[in-house]
């Protein structure tokens, strides 16, 4: 089974909630996914940056900071269920590893 995710800022992320946490440098996130899909601050000032992803099956996951974490390498993974979040976490971890290996090869 392929596990592929792509950014889709128009995907319906309503009802997603924290399922997992992941540590990835903020520069990596911004460099690879571009500007946040979320503009401004949330109504409750708890989210400053968020990206929405969708997989080949139409499942939605979000990657976001929570309460403007002072440690900008800590991100939350949100989804409608833990299985979807876990698939996204696997994809993101593997994507991060591949991109970091590419950087080492170039250096």
Which residues make up each language-model segment?
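N-terminal trafficking/processing presequences and adjacent post-cleavage segments
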Residues: 1-24
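Mixed-charge, Lys/Arg-enriched low-complexity segments
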Residues: 2-10, 77-107
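Amphipathic alpha-helical segments
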Residues: 19-39
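A structural detector for beta-sheet-dominated domains
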Residues: 21-23, 54, 78-80
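Short, intrinsically disordered, mixed-charge
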Residues: 31-35, 68, 93-97
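Amphipathic, interaction-prone secondary-structure segments
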Residues: 35-66
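Intrinsically disordered, low-complexity regulatory segments enriched in Ser/Thr/Pro
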Residues: 61-87
